[in-house]
Amino acid sequence: MQGRLSAWLVKHGLIHRSLGFDYQGIETLQIKPEDWHSIAVIFYVYGYNYLRSQCAYDVAPGGLLASVYHLTRIEDGVDQPEELCIKVFASRRNPRIPSVFWVWKSVDFQERESYDMLGISYDNHPRLKRILMPESWIGWPLRKDYIAPNFYEIQEAH
């Protein structure tokens, strides 16, 4: 089933795939990584002025990695803001997705966490570095094929 935004994107020749609606009736769209930044700018101009959250997950062992964006259109006098969910999939071998930091600043730490936990590189992010794990950590702890080390270095807090 194609939603209003999906139909609008088709009308304007913007490539995407409709993933239907979630249990709350929020439209979910799949966007290719190479198209994501330009479509993000279009959504911002269209009125999706708030990036509520960004997260990432490992779709399947040896499979794709996904970056998920929850956008909200906040307007004066509107009790129920419009919401939209975007999924961008990247290959496990070279997971690269354009950063939308310059569109929505609220994605800063969220993209960094996705990088730190899953190894998705967000191109043009101004401070893409580990945020939870030490810089010396090897691997991406939330990937399904991650092998946890059998030792941990315990450091004293001072």
Curated annotation (Swiss-Prot):
It comes from the Eukaryota. It is a peripheral membrane protein. One of its GO terms (molecular function) is quinone binding. One of its GO terms (biological process) is photosynthesis, light reaction. Keywords: Chloroplast, Membrane, NAD, NADP, Plastid, Plastoquinone, Quinone, Thylakoid, Translocase, Transport. InterPro entries: NADH_DH_suC, NADH_quin_OxRdtase_su_C/D-like, NADH_UbQ_OxRdtase_30kDa_su, NADH_UbQ_OxRdtase_CS. Its EC number is 7.1.1.-. It is found in: Plastid, Chloroplast thylakoid membrane. PROSITE patterns: COMPLEX1_30K. It catalyses: a plastoquinone + NADH + (n+1) H(+)(in) = a plastoquinol + NAD(+) + n H(+)(out); a plastoquinone + NADPH + (n+1) H(+)(in) = a plastoquinol + NADP(+) + n H(+)(out). One of its GO terms (cellular component) is chloroplast thylakoid membrane. NDH shuttles electrons from NAD(P)H:plastoquinone, via FMN and iron-sulfur (Fe-S) centers, to quinones in the photosynthetic chain and possibly in a chloroplast respiratory chain. The immediate electron acceptor for the enzyme in this species is believed to be plastoquinone. Couples the redox reaction to proton translocation, and thus conserves the redox energy in a proton gradient. Belongs to the complex I 30 kDa subunit family. NDH is composed of at least 16 different subunits, 5 of which are encoded in the nucleus. This is NAD(P)H-quinone oxidoreductase subunit J, chloroplastic.
